[in-house]
């Protein structure tokens, strides 16, 4: 691990199984946590579906499982409330540990971060 613990804010904007970017970002997040860095994740646009409960893909690695593991390891995960409303996704459809937020919440995540990564 590096000498200074870093804070990463990761923005996921792609849907769960529309590209590999969400999966790659979740793998990065998990690795960063294992190396004792702090991780914030902001789900925006179609990326909100990465945090949806009851995912059951047959031919892809389950990003929902990755998200659960990352949350259990201490990641701070928030989803854009406006994006959720536009797509008809309610808070009770999100995995436990994911909080609905606004752009103000996203700005706070970015302000505390050493690095912000967009996918």
Where are these regions (language model features)?
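Short, glycine-rich nucleotide/cofactor-binding loops
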Residues: 4, 8-23, 50-57
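Residues at the starts of beta-strands that form the adenosine-phosphate
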Residues: 7, 37-40, 76
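Histidine-anchored nucleotide/phosphate-binding helix
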Residues: 22-37, 41
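Short amphipathic alpha-helical segments and helix-helix/interface helices
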Residues: 29, 64-68, 106-107
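Anion (oxyanion) recognition and catalysis
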Residues: 33-34, 71, 110-111
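Short, conserved active-site loops that position catalytic residues or coordinate cofactors/metal ions
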Residues: 41-52, 82-83
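A glycine-rich helix N-cap at a beta->alpha junction
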Residues: 57-85
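C-terminal structural segments of small proteins and small subunits
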Residues: 87-119
């Amino acid at each position: 691990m590096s000498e200074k613990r870093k804070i990463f804010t990761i923005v996921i904007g792609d849907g769960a199984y529309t590209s590999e970017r969400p999966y790659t970002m979740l793998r990065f997040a998990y690795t960063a946590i294992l190396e004792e860095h702090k991780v914030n994740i902001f789900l925006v646009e179609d990326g909100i579906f990465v945090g949806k409960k009851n995912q059951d893909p047959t031919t892809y690695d389950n990003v929902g499982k990755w998200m659960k593991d990352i949350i259990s390891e201490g990641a701070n995960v928030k989803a854009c409330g406006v994006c959720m409303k536009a797509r008809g996704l309610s808070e009770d459809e999100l995995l436990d540990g994911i909080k609905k937020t606004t752009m103000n919440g996203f700005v706070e995540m970015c302000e505390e971060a050493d690095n912000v990564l967009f996918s």
